[in-house]
């Protein structure tokens, strides 16, 4: 990656870990999606390809760009480590998390619009899968750094089949694994 990355220097745990393994941090999702957009636009064969991305803005400390919308309030900067931020900041941290999701949802929507412009959307299998949930002290710990409770293990999966597929859309509300 040639663009900018971010690393929350206030989070000593991840900052120290990243320095030890000599990585520079996370790539903002806007840049990840722009690289994906350019890659797809330059494909010769837009009928058969695989693209996998790992979006990071919804991971602690919930990256928000300067242009990000913040409908969930109150919300401000806060100090704290992954898995060890002060309980008194729970509402602020949760709102930052929700704002990060709100903005990532808009980024994914824009990527879907791009796939439609490229005439790829109707024929593609498109999946969005969460890697973990997030806790906000419901069971005495934050983030996903403690015991396995629903808050940290329950996540989502969205699967959009190609239009010509014979698979019928469904909403599944019971636990499954991926």
Where are these regions (language model features)?
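Active-site-proximal alpha/beta segments of enzymes that process anionic O-linked groups
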Residues: 1-77
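A short beta-strand-to-alpha-helix junction
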Residues: 27, 91-104, 147-153, 165-178
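A long, amphipathic alpha-helix that forms part
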Residues: 31-43, 75-126
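Proline-centered helix-kink/hinge sites
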Residues: 48, 58-61, 156, 162, ...
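Histidine-centered active-site microenvironments of extracellular/periplasmic hydrolases
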Residues: 67, 116-165
């Amino acid at each position: 990656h040639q663009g900018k990355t971010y690393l929350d220097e206030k989070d000593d745990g991840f900052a120290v870990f990243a320095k030890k393994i000599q990585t520079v941090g996370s790539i903002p999702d806007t840049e990840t999606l722009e690289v994906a957009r350019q890659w797809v636009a330059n494909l010769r064969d837009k009928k058969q390809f695989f693209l996998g991305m790992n979006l990071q803005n919804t991971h602690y400390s919930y990256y928000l760009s300067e242009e990000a919308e913040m409908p969930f309030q109150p919300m401000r900067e806060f100090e704290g480590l992954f898995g060890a931020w002060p309980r008194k900041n729970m509402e602020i941290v949760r709102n930052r998390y929700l704002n990060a999701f709100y903005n990532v949802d808009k980024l994914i929507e824009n990527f879907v619009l791009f796939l439609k412009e490229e005439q790829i959307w109707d024929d593609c299998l498109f999946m969005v899968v969460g890697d973990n949930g997030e806790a906000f002290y419901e069971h005495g710990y934050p983030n996903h750094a403690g015991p396995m409770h629903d808050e940290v293990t329950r996540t989502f999966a969205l699967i959009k089949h190609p239009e010509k597929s014979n698979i019928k859309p469904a909403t599944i509300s019971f636990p499954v694994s991926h």
